[in-house]
Amino acid sequence: MSACMSDPVHLSIDDGIALVTIDNPPVNVTSRAVREGLMAALEGAQAAGVGRVVLTGAGRTFVAGADAKEFSAPPQPPHLPDIVSRIETFPVPVVAAINGAALGGGLELALACAARIAALNATVGLPEVTLGVVPGAGGTQRLPRLIGLENALSLISEGKVIGAAEAEKIGLVDALADNPVEAARRYSWLERPATGALRGPVLNNAAIEAARKQVAKRSPNQIAPQKAIDLIEASCTLLLNDGLEQERAVFLELKSSDQAAALRHVFFAERAAMGQGKTGGADITSAVVVGGGTMGAGIAYALAGLGIDVALVETDETGAARARANIAKLYGEAVARGKSTPEKAEADQAARFRFHVGYDALPAADIAIEAVFEDIDVKRAVFTALDAALPETTILATNTSYLDVNRIAEVVRNPARFLGLHFFSPAHVMKLLEVIRADDTSPETLATALRLAGRMKKIPLLAGVCDGFIGNRILTRYRQTCDIMLIEGALPAQIDAALRGFGMAMGPYEVQDLSGLDIAYANRKRLGWKTKAGFRYIPIADRIVDETGRLGRKTNAGWYDYEGSKASPSALIDAIVIEESKRAGIERRAFSDEEIVARATTAMVEEGLRILEEGIAARSADIDLVMIYGYAFPRWRGGPMHWAGRVGLSEIERRIAEYAAKDPASWAVPNLLARAATEGKTPEDL
């Protein structure tokens, strides 16, 4: 007895055991068709009088949660909680054969089963809070009953995904097996209550309070993790059905919230970006990295971790020794984190790395990545040397943060194989990668770069050539807007506090102190901003560097004064700010936090719209990902462009027009915005 193989759920019966297989590629999400198929399969199994049901997934996934296509739509029957209840109350045991990832609704299905057998490489978790909701089919009520309060708090409120071995250790799965389906057919256990019939966990107020503090630190301003803790706490005292009713109400409330919409937007944007590296391009097996400093070493280490042989180039023996030390440090950190052993780390370094002084003896390589000082003449000299030393088929990539990629490409023989790869530091950790198309970059070169990004588990965002590309261009505009508010009446600590309140991880002046005031100072000198036509130059930051030598945390003084790691507002800096207002003939005025946030974020949006208008970015969602992953814009707000859509483009247009009336050198309504506001479009439509 079996269902049509084109159906997303198959039922087969052998020797009195029903095998129900969810087959909805690629990851067996619980779409409406799957839910209908599960109900039908259970009915068929019951009608056949089987003695056991084994529930599993086709391919390498059990069930990876809800169907993303249904996220924004009203729930359609049959609802997942009804299927979960049907499994839990089924007249014969249902055993979950967890053959791969069991996430979200997939784990909730497994929790309803009489037993859970997991493959050795299976993973389980309830990551719903990362999408702005809570589990909606019993996860917050059944999981604490099964594994205890503390374990459930950690898994659910943090959205953690754990491996099969850890799941068995905490009692989430009953056994591990090479073949979980066969093991589930034979598995025997003592009679025990269904998961939902177990007693609620013992209330532990200290554990709940600790979880709340941890969530507030890890996910500030986010609603879903705190709501999840509320529901887990309720599982200690409520009957199951009362807890399930409360959970479902919270789930449906959060599903329609702004935060859930923002996090869904980011989820889809990530999928679209990471999908770019899954087709086309060639595999990179060997690489040259020029520059063994923090950035270059991070890039080289990440490449070596993929099994790519790396030739690391420095200009002299001192630089080569520093590069070796930087690489050794990264491997040492991996050992300290338990990701490697001393023996393996030493063997990997010996197998993957060769260190070179100069370019004379470089091996042939599939790609060469430059990570040297941000000076166009230095970079052009590097690529002149690389072009002469390497085969004409080698892809050449610059890691510049701001510079004109087309000007650098002028020195190579075949500019079709040249592009920008803007990594973010530390390069082996940060997920963002801006992939810069030069005028002559070939589609094949782009495809290979995107394929490499996928192997590195980066989020690659395509960008055209302009100063700062997507992220640093918006950052520059954001900082300039904050500097203008300084000279008009705000102070650094107030601006930082207001933007942290909005959800930024750090304020702009805290960030500058962390990165070093000399970095932006050098960039302003390079661009000649003091005399740039049509640009409102604010000299405060340059005065701090020129007159005080304060460069930020590296000198224990910058925008703030420092005692160790503790920052405090600087009377000296505040005095310079106020003095600069007087020099400019500006009467200082009070700023509210709301005005600071509105101006700073609207500046990001205006610049983002110009980036779209000029074709530098292809999608507004790409801009959102750059700002979230590279510049700590709050994920739960969806990025600046998504945030603008929630505010409304008509309101953004009104604000910019108002700002432009007072400061036409800094503000103007982009043509793209004017059209979009008139036509009632959102940023996602542009």
Language-model region placement:
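Conserved CoA-thioester-binding segment of acyl-CoA-metabolizing enzymes
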Residues: M1-T56, P78, D82-S85
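N-terminal glycine-rich phosphate-binding loop for ADP-containing cofactors
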Residues: D23, V50-V53, P74-H79, S85, ...
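Acidic glycine-/aspartate-rich tracts in secreted/extracellular proteins
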Residues: G59-R60
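Glycine-rich loop at the start of a catalytic domain that most often binds anionic cofactors/ligands
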Residues: V63-F71
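Gly/Ser-rich catalytic serine loop of serine hydrolases
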Residues: A96, G100-G106
